[in-house]
């Protein structure tokens, strides 16, 4: 079989859906249960928090959940925290979901929801910039107090009640949730806590995604957040899932990998989903016929490493100041892909006190280059960053 570059099945890049969501089957099966409980019983499950490093596929999973909910006729919206105030981002994403709902359901059954949402959105955007595509008057006194936590709780309640009446569900997805302010996180916690007190729980699910620091941030916003969510870690793929990510897309095109070639590719990618897609793409581009062999892999790995270096690591490295790079080098030497203590890092850069590196540490956290998995610890937000740093002059 000739390997055709035009038919390349791999899709490297931020947020791009790979051909196979390898290793994520348990999570998707869990969402299927949420869907069925909402549609068959009118009941909601606990909301989810997905946490993991950069490039492991959190955004891809949110997009997949959005597609599944939308195709099932749910009221589904996806927003991103940190770009604009969260009330504005949620309103903007919900407008599209409301417009879709008006095309699927009789307007009369949506009238109360649309009126409440109109009042909520006017509080967020007083100029009235959001158009629902239908004439609707705002309903005063429910979700328009101007207190985001109270208004969001009221809006979620109306959304859940409407969905139950329609025999469907609501899915709210928020990406980069670690970028939300403490008050925005507290508002989300309050709204979800309020939903869970209904008996039976209303069929609205929120799925937030963010860095591994997100669970601690939610708990700092309100202490009960530790028990509020179903926390799911999205990590590196194990060997079998990594194998599926590389082999299944080519098998569908009658192209195989020989054993040595596959072993070399797997050993280099270390289960990192972003890198696996880059490896697959460049190996395919170098291959001429099936089966893919070790020479194809060796050539492809050079290009894949260059793509990941230039597209993922280099921009992060170049955003750091010299002092911040010193701290990153120390973290790379001490921890690799794990964690190091602030005291160890301070000693490694020749500082007698941890306070002497606190400015550089805080700036690196703000830039999203490192995070604090626990008090007094630091780790890189991107797998493999330590290897890139080791290759720098």
What are these regions (language model features)?
Residues 213-229:
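Short regulatory helix/loop adjacent to the ATP-binding pocket of P-loop NTPases
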Residues 242-311:
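Amphipathic alpha-helical "lid/sensor" segments that cap RecA-like P-loop NTPase cores
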Residues 66-85:
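Conserved catalytic segments around the Walker B and adjacent sensor/switch elements
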Residues 2, 7, 54, 260, ...:
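C-terminal leucine-rich, beta-strand-based interaction scaffolds used for sensing/assembly
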Residues 230-241:
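Conserved AAA+ ATPase "SRH/arginine-finger" region at the nucleotide-binding site
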Residues 1-46, 96, 112, 200:
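A short, basic N-terminal segment
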Residues 139-212:
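Conserved Walker B catalytic segment
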Residues 43-64, 349:
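Walker A/P-loop nucleotide-binding motif
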């Amino acid at each position: 079989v000739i390997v055709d570059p035009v038919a390349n099945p791999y899709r490297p890049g931020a947020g791009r859906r790979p051909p196979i969501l390898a290793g994520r089957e348990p999570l998707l099966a869990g969402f299927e249960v949420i869907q069925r409980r909402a549609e068959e019983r009118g009941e909601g499950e606990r909301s989810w928090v997905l946490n993991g490093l950069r490039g492991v596929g959190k955004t891809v999973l949110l997009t997949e959940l959005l597609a599944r909910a939308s195709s099932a006729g749910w009221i589904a919206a996806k927003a991103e925290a940190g770009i604009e105030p969260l009330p504005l981002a949620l309103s903007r994403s919900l407008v599209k979901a409301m417009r879709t709902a008006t095309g699927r359901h009789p307007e009369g059954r949506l009238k109360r929801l649309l009126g409440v949402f109109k009042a909520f959105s006017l509080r967020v955007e007083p100029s009235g910039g959001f158009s629902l595509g239908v004439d609707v008057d705002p309903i005063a006194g429910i979700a328009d107090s101007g207190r985001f936590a109270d208004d969001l709780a009221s809006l979620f309640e109306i959304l859940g009640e409407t969905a139950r009446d329609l025999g469907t569900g609501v899915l709210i997805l928020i990406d980069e949730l670690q970028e939300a302010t403490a008050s925005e996180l507290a508002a989300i916690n309050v709204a979800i806590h309020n939903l869970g007190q209904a008996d039976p729980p209303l069929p609205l699910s929120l799925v937030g995604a963010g860095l591994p620091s997100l669970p601690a941030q939610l708990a700092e916003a309100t202490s009960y957040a530790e028990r509020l969510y179903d926390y799911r870690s999205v990590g590196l793929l194990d060997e079998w899932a990594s194998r599926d990510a590389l082999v299944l897309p080519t098998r569908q095109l009658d192209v195989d990998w020989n054993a040595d070639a596959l072993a070399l590719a797997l050993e280099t990618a270390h289960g990192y989903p972003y890198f696996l897609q880059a490896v697959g793409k460049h190996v395919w581009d170098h291959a001429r016929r099936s089966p893919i062999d070790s020479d194809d892999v060796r050539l492809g790995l050079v290009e894949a490493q260059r793509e990941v270096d230039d597209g993922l690591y280099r921009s992060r490295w170049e955003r750091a100041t010299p002092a911040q790079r010193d701290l990153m080098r120390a973290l790379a030497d001490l921890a690799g892909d794990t964690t190091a203590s602030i005291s160890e890092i301070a000693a490694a850069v020749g500082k007698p006190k941890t306070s002497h590196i606190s400015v550089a540490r805080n700036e690196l956290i703000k830039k999203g280059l490192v995070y604090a998995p626990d008090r007094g610890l630091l780790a890189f937000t991107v797998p493999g960053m330590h290897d890139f740093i080791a290759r720098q002059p």
